[in-house]
């Protein structure tokens, strides 16, 4: 049986943020499902399915963390013990590629470009998890650096390569792409900073504040992202996002 402080309130009372995160993700998922309930167009359905999956996976992750699952202790070689919610990384390993897939479909990016982008993204998440679980501080910061560099590649690829594909899209699709791209650029850039100043890095922010920050970032990058995407005329009608050509998909 899980200790009360882990199963309900968390290690430092951060359970309140995990509960709010769970509710926020569930509400977002229900909203997306209700909005897409009567959608018949296959291309529109694709956006709804992906966005609902993102919210559902995130809700499951937050709920598991609230009940104390996906939480472990990492004892460093210097004796410092860190409480780590590794379930975040399991969440991100699935949801970040889906977010990129959503925006890639909107932009009309080729399958090859999206495969490259998602591969780099997965590498970013895995090396971030490695940084979190390493017991030697130098190794932790080394893998954090590698993960951050990978993130910069992801953001660069999103702006330059996917952005170029979006330039051929309709005006409405371009406008929506620009907003979603900026959400990803700002929110994702904050994640490694949050790691660095939080309990997994320098310890300048406790687990309570760190969990609050991650919750805000997650809700913005997932539910906020989905809300804007699925309200766009490029998705719901009146304008259409491009689809990758057969030549671009090669």
Curated annotation (Swiss-Prot):
Q: Where in the cell is it found?
A: Membrane
- Source domain of life: Archaea
- Where is the site labelled Primary proton acceptor? 91
Q: Which residues cross the membrane?
A: 14-34, 49-69, 89-109, 114-134, 142-162, 183-203, 210-230
Q: GO biological process: what's one of them? A: phototransduction
Where does the record place the modification N6-(retinylidene)lysine? Answer: 222
Q: Looking at the Swiss-Prot or TrEMBL record, what is one Pfam family this protein matches?
A: Bac_rhodopsin
- Please describe the post-translational modifications of this protein: The covalent binding of retinal to the apoprotein, bacterioopsin, generates bacteriorhodopsin.
In terms of InterPro entries, this protein maps to: Arc/bac/fun_rhodopsins, Rhodopsin_retinal_BS
Reported induction: Expressed constitutively throughout the growth phases, both in presence and absence of white light.
Q: Does the keyword Ion transport apply?
A: yes
- Purpose: Light-driven proton pump.
Q: What is this protein called?
A: Bacteriorhodopsin-II
């Amino acid at each position: 049986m899980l200790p009360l402080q882990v199963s309900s309130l968390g290690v430092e009372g951060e359970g309140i943020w995990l509960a709010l995160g769970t509710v926020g993700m569930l509400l977002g998922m229900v909203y997306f499902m209700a909005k897409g309930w009567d959608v018949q167009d296959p291309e529109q359905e694709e956006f709804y399915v992906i966005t609902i999956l993102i919210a559902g996976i995130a809700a499951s992750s937050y709920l598991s963390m609230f009940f104390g699952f996906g939480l472990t202790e990492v004892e460093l070689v210097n004796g410092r013990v860190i409480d780590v919610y590794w379930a975040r990384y399991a969440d991100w390993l699935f949801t970040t590629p889906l977010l990129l897939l959503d925006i890639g479909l909107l932009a009309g990016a080729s399958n090859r470009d999206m495969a490259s982008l998602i591969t780099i993204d997965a590498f970013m998440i895995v090396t971030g998890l490695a940084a979190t679980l390493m017991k030697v501080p130098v190794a932790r910061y080394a893998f954090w650096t590698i993960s951050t560099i990978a993130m910069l590649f992801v953001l660069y690829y999103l702006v330059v390569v996917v952005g170029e594909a979006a330039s051929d899209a309709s005006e409405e699709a371009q406008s929506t792409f620009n907003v979603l791209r900026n959400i990803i650029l700002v929110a994702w850039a904050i994640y490694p900073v949050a790691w660095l100043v939080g309990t997994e890095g320098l310890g300048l922010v406790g687990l309570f504040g760190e969990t609050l920050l991650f919750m805000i970032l997650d809700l913005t990058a997932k539910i906020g992202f989905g809300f804007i995407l699925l309200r766009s005329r490029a998705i719901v009608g009146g304008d259409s996002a491009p689809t990758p050509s057969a030549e671009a998909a090669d």
